[in-house]
Amino acid sequence: MANIASARKRARQAEKNRQHNMALRSRFRTSVKKVLKAVVAGDKEAAQAALKAAVPVIDGTVNKGLIHKNKAARHKSRLNARVKAM
């Protein structure tokens, strides 16, 4: 455990940021899974709606620095291709 006050504060901040990042990453994964689930089910309207909801979530994770912009672009492109192929 840290003894210096600034180190204790940094530990608190790191834990807070870790919790926040985990929540955002979970939202990202959940939104991607919703699109894939709708695609597998064959429900085109639900897949399009899920994709429309997932894109801002994916972009938000990029803005927060959780994933690289190329990874986000790859996810959006692949999800869009799967929805269009229905």
Curated annotation (Swiss-Prot):
One of its GO terms (cellular component) is small ribosomal subunit. Gene3D superfamilies: Ribosomal protein S20 (1.20.58.110). GO terms for molecular function: small ribosomal subunit rRNA binding; structural constituent of ribosome. This is Small ribosomal subunit protein bS20. The keyword Ribonucleoprotein applies. The lineage of its organism: Bacteria, Pseudomonadati, Pseudomonadota, Gammaproteobacteria, Chromatiales. It comes from Thioalkalivibrio sulfidiphilus (strain HL-EbGR7). Residues 1-22 are annotated as: Disordered. The keyword Ribonucleoprotein applies. It holds the Pfam family Ribosomal_S20p. Binds directly to 16S ribosomal RNA. Transmembrane segments: none annotated.
